[in-house]
Amino acid sequence: MEKRWLNSMLSKGELEYRCRLSKSINSLGPIESEGSIINNMNKNIPSHSDSYNSSYSTVDDLVGIRNFVSDDTFLVRDSNSSSYSIYLDIENQIFEIDNDPSFVSELESSFYSFRNSTYQNNISKNDDSHYDRYMYDTKYSWNNHINSCIDSYLRTQICIDSYILSGSHNYSDSYIYSYICGEGGNSSESESFSIRTSTHGNNLTITESSNDLDNDRTTNYSDFWVICENCHKFNYKRLFKSKMNICEECGYHLKMNSSDRIELLIDPGTWEPMDEDMVSVDPIEWDSEVDPIQWKSQVDPIEGDSEVDLIEGDSEEYKDSSYKDRISSSQIETGLPEAIQTGTGKLNGIPVAIGVMEFEFMGGSMGSVVGEKITRLIDYASNQFLPLILVCASGGARMQEGSLSLMQMAKISSALYDYKYQSNKKLFYVAILTSPTTGGVTASFAMLGDIIIAEPNAYIAFAGKRIIEETLKMEVPEGSQKTEPLFEKGLLDLIVPRNPLKDVVSELFQLHAFVPSNQNSIK
């Protein structure tokens, strides 16, 4: 029998004590059965002033606990080790249990059983120092008691893994009871609340709707949680960066911004950015069109795919905004002037030139400025005899710049040819492909590396699956545009997870006679 301990501070007046519960992993019955499970506790209850380790043989004392949860987000696990997300906001009347009917059904059954149990009728309340004789006198007090009952249920039926507290501790009407037991949830006679959860990318959103259509509220919890695109488990955002944006549950590599990638690859204090003052304009006067094209994504339509389309690409706000406005919006959102960061630094002491694309900036689309910055970086690396790294994360050529964006493919490829062959300097270019790498980027510099490295399960393609199927009227096998099958076909040299990536690239450089600068000075 596995025991799970729950320690919490309980207070009433100036008295403070700790209650400890043990729970069988196999029990998911009514809450009144918990008395038989607590089998290793002391029979005598010590005085509150003498000990903090008070033990109980009934659940009655536990029900008197007020304000256990008021505005919290919980990641919980039941006795079957199934994970659920529970959000409670009593002030705003929101209660959500992960959209799982079976779990809500279990909660409803146990709550009814608990409410009608003999514990309320047969146990003497006069002997309980924590019993409030006004608890059942009014409807409002009864609602408070219901909230306490549910609190007790949650404390005894689930194992709390992690939580976020907001500091509010005020109960209101028993909308939690209504949500669980279905009373009043859809009533037309009283105010009705419904809760919807939605996930897009890595964002968690909970929407509350009332009978008043103008009174919908949406709360975004992406500041706290990151949802894995593969297993849909929650990752705590505060610790996610230290995990290199890798899901702790399944090891899936989620998207990583350019600044974090620079921090991952470049030694601290050695990063020197280049050409930060270069920004895009509207070279073909895209916004002056009389009848502008309604765009679905910010990449060339031939390259578009559901995995590449931007999250904001479907919103009316972005459809109606101009190209310059979208650039300004991306600059504010990312803090970057363009969809790539270029510069120099040291990788394990080895001087390198590096460019890292930023997918959150208009889908990492390649326009004139992106092409110019990459070309200048290549020229600088050639003149300084530096190895070159380009980290690709792009939806392809930027359609708002028309043929000028397509020209960047030839421009960069030509610069790489001079860098690797024409100069006879035997320089070394490593291409690192991340998800997604598509379109014009795939058709140019992404596939021209001396060594081509890809992250696990990255989406790498020229035309997207949907476009191929609609154009050629043939089915594209699921997963055929991922890293692993491309590696098996010989299109990639290495598949390297983020954890050892820096050391792997460092060893490749040393094999090609690029050594740390301090060793070079000694020689």
From Swiss-Prot:
Question: Which cofactors must be present for this protein to function?
Answer: Zn(2+)
The similarity annotation says: Belongs to the AccD/PCCB family.
Q: So what does this thing catalyse?
A: N(6)-carboxybiotinyl-L-lysyl-[protein] + acetyl-CoA = N(6)-biotinyl-L-lysyl-[protein] + malonyl-CoA
Give the CC-aspect GO terms. acetyl-CoA carboxylase complex; chloroplast stroma
Q: What else is known?
A: The sequence shown is from cv. Gy14/Chipper.
* A single GO BP: malonyl-CoA biosynthetic process
Q: Report the record's disulfide bonds.
A: none
What is the protein's name according to its record? Acetyl-coenzyme A carboxylase carboxyl transferase subunit beta, chloroplastic
- CoA carboxyltransferase N-terminal domain boundaries: 224-523
Q: Could you give a GO molecular-function term held by this entry?
A: ATP binding
In short, the EC number is 2.1.3.15
Task: State the oligomer form and interacting partners.
Answer: Acetyl-CoA carboxylase is a heterohexamer composed of biotin carboxyl carrier protein, biotin carboxylase and 2 subunits each of ACCase subunit alpha and ACCase plastid-coded subunit beta (accD).
**What does the cofactor section's free text say about binding?**
Binds 1 zinc ion per subunit.
Q: Where in the cell is it found?
A: Plastid, Chloroplast stroma
- Functional note: Component of the acetyl coenzyme A carboxylase (ACC) complex. Biotin carboxylase (BC) catalyzes the carboxylation of biotin on its carrier protein (BCCP) and then the CO(2) group is transferred by the transcarboxylase to acetyl-CoA to form malonyl-CoA.
What keywords were assigned to this record? ATP-binding, Chloroplast, Fatty acid biosynthesis, Fatty acid metabolism, Lipid biosynthesis, Lipid metabolism, Metal-binding, Nucleotide-binding, Plastid, Transferase, Zinc, Zinc-finger
Zinc finger (C4-type) residue ranges? 228-250
Residues engaged in binding Zn(2+): C228, C231, C247, C250
**Pathway of this protein?**
Lipid metabolism; malonyl-CoA biosynthesis; malonyl-CoA from acetyl-CoA: step 1/1
Q: Does the keyword Lipid biosynthesis apply?
A: yes
**Highest taxon in the source lineage:** Eukaryota
Note the Pfam families from the entry. Carboxyl_trans
HAMAP family referenced in this protein's UniProt entry, alphabetically? AcetylCoA_CT_beta
